[in-house]
Amino acid sequence: MAIERGSKVKILRKESYWYGDVGTVASIDKSGIIYPVIVRFNKVNYNGFSGSAGGLNTNNFAEHELEVVG
């Protein structure tokens, strides 16, 4: 099954904050960059300023670091 926009994917990159989590593909860059797939998650990571609830809820991945689920 090919990865496309809107697909639900499981993260296989072990050093990622979202390892094992499921996110939604927001976009796929076709220009040949190393990490072309932008994945959006429901929770934010640990980045942010002290005292703020901010953080990132997207990250770039290579296609081999993702597994399509359902």
UniProtKB/Swiss-Prot annotation:
Topology relative to the membrane: Peripheral membrane protein
Keyword annotations of the record: Membrane, Photosynthesis, Photosystem I, Thylakoid
Gene Ontology BP annotations: photosynthesis
Ranges in a coiled coil: none
InterPro entries assigned to the protein according to its UniProt record, in alphabetical order: Elect_transpt_acc-like_dom_sf, PSI_PsaE
Tagged with keyword Acetylation: no
GO CC list: photosystem I reaction center; plasma membrane-derived thylakoid membrane
Listed Pfam families: PSI_PsaE (PF02427)
Protein's job: Stabilizes the interaction between PsaC and the PSI core, assists the docking of the ferredoxin to PSI and interacts with ferredoxin-NADP oxidoreductase.
Family, as annotated: Belongs to the PsaE family.
Protein name, per record: Photosystem I reaction center subunit IV
